[in-house]
Amino acid sequence: MSTVIATYLLHDEKDIRKKAEGIALGLTVGTWTDLPALEQEQLRKHKGEVVGIEELGESGPANEYFDKRLKRAIVKIAYPTVNFSADLPALLATTFGKLSLDGEVRLLDLELSDEWKRHFPGPRFGIAGIREKVGVYDRPLLMSIFKGIIGRDLAYLTSELKKQALGGVDLVKDDEILFDNELLPFEKRITAGKAALQEVYEQTGKRTLYAVNLTGKTFELKEKAKRAAELGADVLLFNVFTYGLDVLQGLREDENINVPIMAHPAFSGAMTPSEFYGVAPSLLLGKFLRLAGADFVLFPSPYGSVALEREQALGIARALTDEQEPFARAFPVPSAGIHPGLVPLLVRDFGLDCIVNAGGGIHGHPDGAIGGGQAFRAAIDAALAGRLLREAVKENEALQKAIDRWGAIEVEA
C-alpha cells in the first residue's frame, strides 16, 4: 500500500503515543476501536498508522517557555495515499491542515513514494539548464538584487541593469516588492531589460539574465507568464508563498511557459521560525519548492541580516540538490546581508552549485554596482583558488574597497 510518511516534532504534557495515535486516526478514518469488525476491515486501507516514535526527553528551555513540563518526541505517521488526490493542497490539508492548529506540533518532513513523486514536475531547467543559459560551469553564479527601483522609470532601470551586468553578475533579479506599475510596466521591463543586457553582451561577450517579478491576481498569472515567455523573458521571479505551492506547480507544468522560475521566500517566515510550530525550512523551502518546479530557491543565509541557523540553511540546500531524487537539482540561493567578505563562507558551506546573491553588497560598494560586482567576482575566484581575501585584495582594488567597508571572514585551508 502506498503511503506518505509525515515526521513531526511533538511537545505534550500527556502520553505522546496516545497523542500520536489520535493524530493518525483523526486525520484518516476518525475512530477505530469502536468500529465493528466488518467496518474495520473495509476501512483498514484508509487508516493512518504510527510507524515510529523517538522520545527526546524534556527540554528545559521549552518547559520554562510554556511554564509546564512537556514531553518531546519525533513521531512518524504513515498516511495511505488512497485517501487524497495527488496534489500538494490535498497532501498538506491531510498531514498538517487542522493539525497545525492543535498545540505544539511541527511538521519536519514528508516522505513520498517513488510512485507518488511521479505526480510532480520538479524544475524544468534546474542547475544544469541555468548554467547552460549563462555559459558558466566552474563557479558559483553571482546575482544582483535590483534595489532602489521603486518610483523609478525605464531609463533608470536600463541604466542600472547595464551597470550590474558590467560588474560581471550572471543574473539580476527584480525586488520582490516591485509590482506592475505605470512607471515600470511588466512587459516593458522585459523588453527594455533584454535590450539593455544585449548591449552589454555585445560589448563584453558576457551573458546576464534578468529575473522579472511575476505579480498580479492569481487567475491572471498564467496568461501574464505566457506573454512573458513570448517576449523572451529570461527568468520569472515568483513570490510563491503569497500565492501557494500549487500555483507554482501550475506555472511550471504549462508548456507555453518555457521560462525558469525563481522562488522567493517572502511570507514563508510566517510558517518556519518557531521550534514548536509550523514547518521545517528544509521541507517548506527545500523539498516542496523542488517538487513544485522551482529552478532557483532563495532563502536566508546563516550569516546575513535575516539569518537562519546554519544547519537549517544547509538542510534546504541538501533538499534542493539531493541527487537521489528523480528531479533536476534546483539552485540554492542563500541570501540577505551578503557582502564580498562572506563569500569564503558561502563557498565552504554551499559549494560550487549555489548562487551568491547580493543587494546592498553590490549597490553599496564605493564604486557603485560595477565595483560591487567586480569585488564579488574577485572574492569568488579567490575562494575557489583557496586564497585568503587579505591576499587577494592586493591584486584587486574593488575587492579591497569592499573589505574595507564590510570586513571579511576568512576560511583557512
From Swiss-Prot:
Catalytic activity as recorded in UniProt: 5-methylsulfanyl-2,3-dioxopentyl phosphate = 2-hydroxy-5-methylsulfanyl-3-oxopent-1-enyl phosphate
Domain of life: Bacteria
Its EC number(s): 5.3.2.5
GO biological process: carbon fixation; L-methionine salvage from methylthioadenosine
Keyword vocabulary terms for this entry: Amino-acid biosynthesis, Isomerase, Magnesium, Metal-binding, Methionine biosynthesis
Catalytic site: K98 (proton acceptor)
InterPro entries: Diketo-Methiopentyl-P_enolase, RuBisCO, RuBisCO_lsu_C, RuBisCO_lsu_C_sf, RuBisCO_lsu_fd_N, RuBisCO_lsu_N_sf
Pathway linked to the protein: Amino-acid biosynthesis; L-methionine biosynthesis via salvage pathway; L-methionine from S-methyl-5-thio-alpha-D-ribose 1-phosphate: step 3/6
A GO term for molecular function: ribulose-bisphosphate carboxylase activity
Entry-linked Pfam families: RuBisCO_large (PF00016), RuBisCO_large_N (PF02788)
Entry binding sites for substrate: K147, K173, D174, D175, E176, H264, G337, G359, G360
Binding site for Mg(2+): K173, D175, E176
Modified residues (N6-carboxylysine): K173
Cofactor note: Binds 1 Mg(2+) ion per subunit.
Cofactors, names only: Mg(2+)
Purpose of the protein: Catalyzes the enolization of 2,3-diketo-5-methylthiopentyl-1-phosphate (DK-MTP-1-P) into 2-hydroxy-3-keto-5-methylthiopentenyl-1-phosphate (HK-MTPenyl-1-P).
Remarks, miscellaneous: Has no RuBP-carboxylation activity.
Family under the similarity heading: Belongs to the RuBisCO large chain family. Type IV subfamily.
Assembly, per entry: Homodimer.
Protein name: 2,3-diketo-5-methylthiopentyl-1-phosphate enolase
Originating organism: Geobacillus thermodenitrificans (strain NG80-2)
Upper lineage: Bacteria, Bacillati, Bacillota, Bacilli, Bacillales
